[in-house]
Amino acid sequence: MKRLILPFLSVGLLLGTTAHAATPLKTEQDKLSYSMGVMTGKAFRKHDIKIDPQTFSMGLSDAYLGKETQMTEAEMRQTLQQFEKQSLQKMQHKMKQTAQQNAEKSRAFLTANKNKPGVKTLANGLQYKVLQAGQGQSPTLNDEVTVNYEGRLINGTVFDSSYKRGQPATFPLKSVIKGWQEALTRMKPGAIWEIYVPPQLAYGEQGAPGVIGPNEALIFKVNLISVKKK
């Protein structure tokens, strides 16, 4: 319950406005109160929380001024618990729908992509295209690699890029997603590949909240710069 409710209430605790005609914001307290009200309202809208603004203001005012509330603590707790339960069910349903939609889009993309010139497909579904060949010994899962890369969603949105940061990334090969492991252990230093990673070899049904949705196929341009043997 705290995850869904308290962030909004903590922002709005000083809000004392109701749905009246606009009044001038003369003092800093006026501006602060209004700003917190706007922030709280935006949070409710963002999370699709349906409230009655006047009743919300009444409850806020009663609590802030120390007045007797119109509901007991037990009644309010039960109401908020029921709200959280419904919100969680709604969120899970939406996630399931999104996962199904993304899975269909990913399958369609990979099915079309595998027939494009230069694209090769491995037995596990990973697809890749060699943009530049490399030389030397390929890394093993026990090695550390240094790479430059750009990650994109299938709609073209760039979600991560070492090129933009201006600095290559170095990491143990064991620490990255399966799709990267499969590709990099086949690459040689200096190679540049574009890899097309199905959801099960990327972030799966969980996704990476805020960045990558559930069941999203990903596209990476990867330049293997060097390998450090372990």
Swiss-Prot record:
GO terms for cellular component: extracellular region; membrane. Its EC number is 5.2.1.8. Keywords: Isomerase, Rotamase, Secreted, Signal, Virulence. It is an enzyme of class 5 (isomerase). Residues 142-230 form the PPIase FKBP-type domain. GO terms for molecular function: peptidyl-prolyl cis-trans isomerase activity. This is Peptidyl-prolyl cis-trans isomerase Mip.
